[in-house]
Amino acid sequence: MEFSPPLQRATLIQRYKRFLADVITPDGRELTLHCPNTGAMTGCATPGDTVWYSTSDNTKRKYPHTWELTQSQSGAFICVNTLWANRLTKEAILNESISELSGYSSLKSEVKYGSERSRIDFMLQADSRPDCYIEVKSVTLAENEQGYFPDAVTERGQKHLRELMNVAAEGQRAVIFFAVLHSAITRFSPARHIDEKYAQLLSEAQQRGVEILAYKAEISAEGMALKKSLPVTL
C-alpha cells in the first residue's frame, strides 16, 4: 500500500495530550499534528525522531496534518497510526499474502458477535469451511528486536481473547492476528511485564484452539505491506 499523496518529513519536538504532537519542518516551520494513537507509544515518540505525516484536504479539520510514521534515531521505521493495522491486514488477506488466511471467498468487516457485545475486525467465509473470526492488534513496542503487545494494560484486549475462546468452542475458526508495525522487530511475545492477565489469557486462548499469528510489515516513507511471518513465544 503506497502513501498517496507522498508523506512529508519533520522532526518531533514533543507529543502531548495523547492526540497532539509538535514538530518542526526542514524549512523551520512549527506544526501541530494529530496523533492517531491513544497508547503509551513507548519508543515511538522520542524528541528528535523523524516524523512522517500526511495532510488532509478537509478544510474543516482543526489539525489537518496526521502523524503516520516515526523514523527513530537508530533508523527503524514505526507506524504509529493504529488505523493502518486493519488496512494492511485486509490488503494482505485479499492479496493472499497470509497463507494461513487464504482460500476464503468472502471478507466482512466489523461484524457484531459474542456475549460481550464485541465487533470482530474481520470475518472470512467460504463454502464447506467454518467461519474465520480475526481480531487484529497493532504491535509497535520493541526491546532488543523483541516485539510486545500490549504497551499498556488492556481490558478491551482481554475481552477480545475471551470472545475468541468462545468462538473456538463453538467450532468456528478464531484467530488473533498481531500486525507488527516496527521494522526492528524480529519476534513476538505478549508483554507479560506490562499486562500479566493478557499474557495468561493469550496462553489459555491458544490451548483452547485460538490461532496466534504475527506478521511483520515492510515499512518505508513510500508505503507499507505485511510480508513476513514472525515466531511467537508465549
Swiss-Prot record:
It holds the Pfam family SfsA. CDD domains: SfsA-like_bacterial. Keywords: DNA-binding. GO terms for molecular function: DNA binding. Residues 201-220 bind DNA. Belongs to the SfsA family. NCBIfam families: sfsA. Binds to DNA non-specifically. Could be a regulatory factor involved in maltose metabolism. This is Sugar fermentation stimulation protein A. It comes from Shigella flexneri serotype 5b (strain 8401). The lineage of its organism: Bacteria, Pseudomonadati, Pseudomonadota, Gammaproteobacteria, Enterobacterales.
